[in-house]
Amino acid sequence: MNRSTGIESCSFTRGLVRGAGGLLLAALGLSPHWAAATAPTVSPPAVPPPLPLSDAAEQLTEIMVEAREPRYVAPTRRDQIGRIWAPVFINGRGPFRLVLDTGASNSGVTAMVALALGIPTDQSPHVMLRGVTGSADVPTIRVDTLSVGDLAVDSPILPIIPDALGGAQGILGSEGLVNKRIFIDFSHDKIAITYSRGERSGHDFVSVPFRSNRGQLIIIDAMVGPVRTKAIIDTGGQTTIGNLALRQALAQHNIGFHGKPDQIQGATLAVESGELIATPPIKFGTIAINDSGVTFADVYIFKHWKMTSEPAIMIGMDALGTLDTLIIDYRRHEMQIRMAKSG
């Protein structure tokens, strides 16, 4: 069965992940053993009391998180598979290791982080946390600031997500990224989040335009073999997942008849059966990602996004991690990609 204000460049760690299962980190109720977890090293000992929730904050009732629970995780600087960890400061404390998740509408943290910040969760407001395999009602905390690089979010409401992140301490979602530029250098394990100045791509980069919905999902037009496909760029997921409409379209071209059974399990413990298939290259712009393995399943999130009638795919870090450099410019609505050199 199957990520202090002013930091502009910082290291990230990727976890090696094998297999196609292990799916969403959306929403498991807190288990009673979380308080025994070891808190990260943080500075000042005194923590101000949590801020009261405003009327607007109380209206927040639903949050999307797309990061998936890994099967196997081992920090590595060599393998191009795994999620991106960004060092994030919360209320000036940290840094905490949050997974950069372009499939998440909001950031979230584990109960261990809430404990380290000294913020109780037992009587906090709840939100509906939605993920790949299901949804659940979870508590929230409100903090003063969340910052990394040029990204600074004031008074964010953070859902408490399960401590099943393979060593990460939460999710860095897309709120606050509307005018930002994310630079990810896989070859040197570097990430920078800065204000976008509308820079054009370099001569050795390929530009791929994207569109986004209200939740800031990154949506591009792609081809999987001969099939036109709507693709979601999902830096929070280790693996690539296709819907059944894409599976059926490939089958019409006699592609993918020799898959093997797979299971997708989210942090809600909901399990959905899937089929792991070696597919033709995934192409977008002039980029081609070869040796693609896609798990096809009728997962909850495709239904929630109303992406069941036409071919759709969530491109995870097993594919994105094969790139040399990935730039996501939210102001330009453009990805700028440099492929890794072969050999």
PLM features: residue spans?
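Bacterial N-terminal signal peptides
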Residues: 19-32
